[in-house]
């Protein structure tokens, strides 16, 4: 796999560093960022190049952009990213909507929530993040009614070829590369066992089933034990409270069973906070969340008030890192320095704006990268186009992306994962 936009991002990072007076500290050490989300976005406006860079100075014209996310309880970062984009361009230009928490049982409501945005005659783009079941059908209905509306899917829960057939653009976390890199990082930190926590609905998704297959294969390469654990689905009858209670109750037994050198991973956002809370208490490793962010589970697990740091991911990361060090958990917990969900919601909307303004092509990966960097100005990203493991067909509108992993400690450090060459065999593991 080629790092198709590594040179662009190197240039982005160079400009971002120059804007900080040449400071080469990690995000957790650099306290120079603004606590205002808008300021972070303005800093990112300097990060692009060529037409993409120029477009970042442009506002939203006589049209509207809609963003659909989950609720704060299900996917807070996704929602906060949408709110940041709306705050930047105005409520009169950006419409936000929330699909039901129990989206699997309320499929028609989910579809209608997305489709309703097309009732606005000035609507020109609809972004859904995460693209839960029903998004594909909603996009098809929108295209039938309003073919002029750009449809962008972030983090698809449906099969990527399927949602790619209805969406103009799909961006997903790189489940293949990350499946390998998470195991590799756990091994480098000293873990001897990897515990994967999920439930049948998630394991039916191609993205998650392929990732877990890659993880299991990578454990063989690094001589680690691989374990599957099942936890309740938060969209089932037990709801989020019941699912979280299960994690809280079972982690101590898992730590006793697998030892303190086991690394854990869960596929659901709602499981993350209780998992982190108990691992900090009882011992273990956590490389990064399913959708990584310093906000994903850490504030609640550590009892942090991040009101003053809101919108400034460098300060958020520093506070989370400091709390972990104080609790004796240094070098055991990681994340992406900038929230994936936050960046994806806001960045894909930024890209849609650039496409509507006529300065970017919808499937130009360099332009997508520049838009993402508006909300993650110092991030090192990598990725590749999606290839169907069964058919071998490569999609021209589905992209897989990931950010370098940051392990929190004293000092913390980036693992250099964005520069690691993934062994070719893992791209056909399924």
List the predicted regions and their residue ranges.
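Extracytoplasmic "Venus flytrap"
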Residues: 53-85, 89, 96-112, 127-133
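Flexible loop/hinge segments that line or gate small-molecule binding clefts
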Residues: 142-175
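Extracellular/periplasmic periplasmic-binding protein-like sensory domains
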Residues: 218-226, 273-357
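Hydrophobic alpha-helical segments within soluble ligand-binding/sensing domains
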Residues: 59, 169-195, 246, 313-324, ...
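Hinge/cleft segment of the Venus flytrap/periplasmic-binding protein
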Residues: 316-430
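C-terminal motif of bacterial Sec signal peptides marking the signal peptidase cleavage site
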Residues: 15-19
């Amino acid at each position: 796999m080629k790092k198709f936009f590594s040179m662009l991002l190197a240039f982005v990072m160079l400009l971002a560093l120059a804007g900080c007076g040449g400071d080469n500290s990690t995000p957790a050490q650099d306290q120079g960022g603004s606590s205002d989300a808008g300021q972070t976005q303005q800093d990112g406006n300097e990060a692009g190049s060529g037409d993409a860079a120029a477009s970042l100075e442009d506002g939203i014209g006589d049209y509207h952009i809609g963003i659909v996310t989950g609720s704060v309880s299900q996917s807070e970062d996704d929602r906060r990213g949408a709110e940041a984009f709306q705050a930047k361009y105005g409520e009169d230009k950006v419409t936000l909507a929330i699909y039901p928490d129990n989206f699997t049982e309320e499929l028609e409501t989910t579809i209608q929530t997305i489709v309703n945005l097309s009732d606005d005659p000035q609507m020109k783009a609809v972004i859904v993040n995460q693209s839960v079941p029903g998004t594909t059908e909603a996009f098809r209905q929108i295209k039938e009614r309003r073919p002029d509306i750009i449809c962008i899917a972030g983090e698809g829960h449906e099969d990527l070829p399927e949602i790619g057939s209805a969406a103009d653009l799909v961006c997903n976390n790189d489940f293949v590369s990350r499946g390998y890199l998470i195991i590799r990082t756990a091994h480098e930190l000293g873990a001897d066992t990897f515990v994967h926590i999920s439930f049948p609905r998630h394991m039916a998704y191609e993205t998650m089933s392929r990732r877990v297959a890659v993880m299991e294969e990578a454990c063989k390469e690094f001589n680690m034990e691989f374990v599957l654990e099942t936890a309740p689905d938060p969209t089932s009858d037990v709801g989020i409270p019941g699912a979280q209670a299960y994690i809280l109750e079972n982690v101590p037994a898992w730590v006793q069973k697998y030892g303190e050198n086991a690394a854990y991973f869960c596929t659901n956002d709602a499981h993350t906070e209780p998992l982190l809370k108990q691992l900090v208490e009882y011992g273990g490793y956590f490389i990064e969340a399913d959708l990584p962010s310093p906000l994903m589970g850490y504030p609640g697990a550590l009892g942090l008030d991040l009101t003053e740091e809101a919108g400034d991911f460098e300060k958020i990361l520093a506070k989370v890192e400091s709390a972990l060090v104080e609790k004796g958990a240094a070098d055991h917990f990681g994340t992406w320095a900038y929230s994936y969900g936050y960046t994806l919601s806001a960045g894909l909307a930024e890209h849609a704006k650039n496409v509507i303004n006529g300065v970017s092509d919808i499937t130009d990966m360099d332009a997508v990268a520049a838009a993402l960097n508006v909300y993650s100005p110092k991030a090192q990203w990598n990725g590749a186009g999606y290839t169907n493991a069964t058919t071998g067909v490569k999609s021209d509108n589905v992209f897989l992306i990931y950010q370098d992993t940051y392990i929190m400690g004293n000092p913390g450090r980036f693992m250099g994962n964005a520069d690691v060459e993934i062994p070719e065999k893992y791209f056909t593991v399924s």
